[in-house]
Amino acid sequence: MKNIFKSTFLMICLLLLLACEAKDNDKKVTDSISGIYPHLAYYNNEAECGTGAVVPWADRLWVITYGPHLPNGSSDKLYEITPDMKQIVREESIGGTPANRMIHKESNQLFIGPYAINSEGAVRAIPYSSMQGRHTGNARHLTDPANIIYYGSMEEGFYEVDVHSLEVKMLYQDGNKDGRRHEDTDVNPTNALLPGVHGKGLYSGQGIMYYTNNGEGTEEALRKFDVEAGVLAEWDGKDWNVARRNQFVEVTGPGGIYGNKNPETDPIWATGWDYKSVLLGVRDAKKGWSFFRLPKASHSYDGGHGWNTEWPRIRDIGTEASPDYLMTMHGLFWSFPGTFTVDNVTGIRPRSAYLKVIGDYSRWNDQLVFGCDDSAQKEFLNIRKAKGGIEGPGQSNSNLWFTSLTKPDELGPATAEGAVWAKEEVKAGETSEPFLFSGWAKRSCWVSNSGKNDVTYLFEVDAAGNNQWTKLKEVKIEAGKAAIIPFTSSERGEWIRVTVDKPTYTTVSFNYATPDNRTTGADNMFAGLTKVGKSNSMGGLLYGLGKNRRALGLLANTTTAGSVVETGYYEMGDKLELIRKDDTETSDFIRTKFAIPQQVVTIDNSSVLIVDDDGRRWRLPLGNEAFKPLTDQALLRICREVATERDLFNCMGTFYELPAENADGYAKIRPISSHNLRINDYASYRGMLIMTGITPEEGKDNPHIIISNDKKAAIWAGVIDDLWKLGKPIGHGGPWKDTEVKSGEPSDPYLIGFYDKRELTLSHNSQKDIIFTVEVDPTGNGDWMEYTTFTVKPDESLKHQFSGDFEARWIRFKTNADTKATSFLIFS
């Protein structure tokens, strides 16, 4: 009996121990981080692994991935996600570069990529030998929609597919017909059928099939963002017509993935852009196309080749009873009205700014699911000296991002700008295209009259979105002069347009901002990241491993009293457990290839000086002075790609979104948030943003802090869009601080855009009055305009508060005499 009691007691103790261990493991291992389920990440063996389409169907979520230029198939897969978040890799997968999706109601099938999926989840694949190309869109057939659908490829291959037999009939041959392998960084293949390259959208309605592309197949387009590129084209079943020669992406209608319910009369919508602003088209069956312009929050999507966009969309994320359209375009989530027609162009509104690169999205189980393009093994043309010799991850991977239905309203401020005319000749009496005027609390317009005549600019508004225009105001601008035109809250309208009374050479840029209600303090999710003033921290260099290891490598270090010592090599898989490994080869590789580059920026007493890869000079604000020695010693990562084909730049306590050089790079940099964190390194992995520089005891209750099993290494895990919660951008500095300046010579450009409150102080050491001329560039395109002049007396520190409706991208200064000058700005 005694032995029985003893055995029972031991068994109870063992069970309690196991229960405690399981509880501890539950604390350590989290199913999801910031809406990312690490085990749902997908990999391929290609230079990029983006998400082409995300569709709920047959009680599952179906996902396809793509590699960069693979018209004959690839290692990419078709994935089936179950409601309990299990990932099934379908054995029918044949890969490629697909981004098409359509639900064909009559046959009750989902067409996604080269696959047809019935209502029971059975999959059939259409081989690339029958239908070559990078499948970019589907459309309902013009004459037999019950039995046939259209497929379109990125190189203008067009096909009819029998929905029953999947028999394929080629209408126009794909541009990859020669069978040669296309290098990912070469000029896009061209096809004689249509202008432009890099197809994006396909749809049908009003007796027409519509096709878009967003690039140009020239060497020039690989380098520049402001070349002629792209097309919106129409096909009536016999002949092609170019509707507009610009970079277009989405083309759809209120019927979305199903096709329009009333195809003869329902509107067709198209989104695109040029170097000036976002384009929005709407087509009426009788009146044809009407076009409108919207501002850009992010310029990282620009580029004449069209590669930087993935697939911007307009998707219905509502319910069958209550449709709700969400649009993605140039870094903004937009609310898009399902009632948008040529005669009712009201209701489009900005929601919030985002950083993820999104290929497709949908509503599933009362959440939003965004399919992203996160970690490309090859950075393509996105190389710059600020990154040093760093590479992409060893293997491309991306993930789904699950969010609440309200997340599109909760990210970054919707500050944005766009032009209707940009350094161009305009005729007398010419009227601009309508530009969106509603949706922002702070609005202004910059106008530069570089012509020979004094010009009156007439501003008109369409108050109700019904094409009824009324005069808002007239502004006369002298030849060779510029002006900022603020708009009050009482000056209302859906759209605004501009007319000039004389011929001129002009720029007209609308610059809008929403109030930044963030504080300067970080959200609790960042607890445990080391403060910059501390001399002790757990850091490390990060690398997503290749060779199908599907883990994150961390070459850990510890900083004690300012001295950095390497502490070992660790790996983390999809269970988010940091485990020490003995791997000299990988350790050496990370140490060599992912070392933080030396002296890629210059931090002087006035600001951060950047000389970009084209030799252009830019200046950014300073932050906490403790960042300077750490930056100079290459202890803080400055620049890295953590979302495909754009960089995350971190300098002097501010994170910035940095477009690729071919999207104009630093000229279009955008501050995200400011912080006081000693971040050693950062990288993307399985859809997450990973950062090092941890004080573990301060983050012990934070699920975003992951500590190794031996307690000697740690990382922070979240998503890139968590960075909006670090705190609003702040800083101080300027292009001059007790600087010897020459009369009439402009200073370097200094960033002023996207900050909340801005104060300027001007001073000099001369014994006479000095006139300071203040110029701004509202667009980032070198559109320098005089803002104002200030006369500063000897020994005076002149202060100027910028008004709340002031918004521009860059600022610079000139003086009317040689002097030693200071131009100092505080952003708070």
Label each PLM-derived region with a short phrase.
Residues W62-G95, G113-P127, D162, Y172, ...:
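Beta-propeller domains
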Residues P68-N72, I117, E156-G157, E216-E219, ...:
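Short glycine/acidic-enriched loop and turn motifs that connect beta-strands
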Residues E46-A53, S93-S107, S130-N147, G175-Q206, ...:
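Repeated scaffold domains used in trafficking and secretory/extracellular systems
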Residues S489-T506, G804-T819:
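Noncatalytic modules at the cell exterior or secretory-pathway interfaces
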Residues D76-P83, L222-K238, L280-D284, S335, ...:
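Beta-propeller blade signature
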Residues L40-D76, G95-M102, P434-L436, R443, ...:
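Beta-strand-rich domains and repeat architectures in extracellular enzymes and scaffolds
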Residues D360-A422, D681-E740:
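Blade-level signature of beta-propeller repeat domains, shared across WD40, Kelch, NHL, RCC1
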Residues I268-A270, V278, L294-T341, F435-S438, ...:
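Loop/turn-rich, solvent-exposed surfaces of beta-rich toroidal or solenoidal domains
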